[in-house]
Regions:
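Short loop/turn segments immediately following beta-strands, especially the blade-tip
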Residues: 87-91
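ATPase catalytic-site recognition across NTP-hydrolyzing enzymes
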Residues: 13-73
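Short beta-strand scaffold segments in enzyme catalytic cores
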Residues: 81-86
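Hydrophobic/aromatic beta-strand patches that form the interior of the parallel beta-sheet core
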Residues: 4-6, 71, 126
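Short, glycine/acidic-enriched loop or turn micro-motifs at the edges of active sites
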Residues: 77
């Protein structure tokens, strides 16, 4: 017997009038309103980010040439490798997630080929502390494998300026920017929003499942001070990247 999922929205329940919908939405937490009205899955109790997609989502745009760019990556094999790129408007201290990538059971070469086109050879990449672990085949640190394929990984693993690198500190930092309207994500990055909706705590502890892109974005966020503008070969007014 096969199984399948059907998404139902308020349009499928004609007995609900506009006034009924307004009353229900008013009594529903913001981060659950899309789930209630449009059938989009979202964790309820224990959500790490009690926000809706619309609190973060923005339409893609060409990133101005002077904005700083930084990438972040989270290593993985059976659980996916993930990468994210942030663009930082330092004039307003607003951060935009412009690109993301997630793939499991692929080699560093495959990942590097997929993400190197986002920026330029000097794009700085933040990475987690497990990148210092030595590989079983040739003894090279995991981070070095990505350097050997041409990516500009930062000299040390991701941490804040004060040296801290805890999970909670990174998540709370991102949350502050999100709630202030200063962490945005391009609307078409569906894989990121899937993780964003389901990221949750159990017994007060963050569940480390299906959070690969969030982790990659978190490492980039922690190292945004190392972001750089893409060198320009033409007039500076040209956009750095196209989404």
């Amino acid at each position: 017997m096969s199984k399948y999922v059907v998404t139902a929205t308020w349009d499928d329940v004609p007995h609900l009038g506009d006034e009924d919908k307004a009353d229900i939405l008013a009594s529903t937490p913001p981060h659950l309103r899309d789930a209630r009205s449009r059938g989009i899955p979202h964790i309820g109790s224990g959500a790490v980010f009690p926000l809706s997609d619309d609190d973060l989502a923005c339409e893609p745009f060409e990133v101005p040439a002077h904005w700083a760019l930084v990438g972040g990556m989270d290593f993985g094999w059976d659980h996916p490798f993930a990468a994210a790129m942030l663009a930082h408007d330092r004039d307003t201290d607003t951060i935009y997630l412009t690109h993301c990538y997630r793939q499991k059971q692929a080699t560093p070469l495959i990942h590097c080929e997929a993400i190197r086109k986002w920026g330029w050879p000097g794009l700085p990449w933040a990475w987690p502390h497990d990148g210092n672990q030595h590989g079983k085949s040739d003894g090279r640190p995991l981070a070095q494998l990505y350097r050997d394929h041409g990516l500009n990984l930062l000299s040390d693993f991701a941490r804040f300026a004060d040296g801290s690198y805890g999970l909670e500190a990174g998540i709370m930092g991102m949350m502050e920017y999100m709630q202030a309207g200063r962490f945005k994500a391009f609307r078409h990055l569906s894989e990121f929003f899937e993780e964003f909706r389901m990221y949750h705590r159990k017994n007060g502890v963050i569940v480390k499942e299906r959070e690969d892109l969030i982790s990659a974005a978190r490492y980039a966020f922690m190292c945004r001070r190392f972001g750089e503008a893409k060198p320009q070969s033409g007039p500076a007014r040209l956009a750095v990247i196209r989404y």
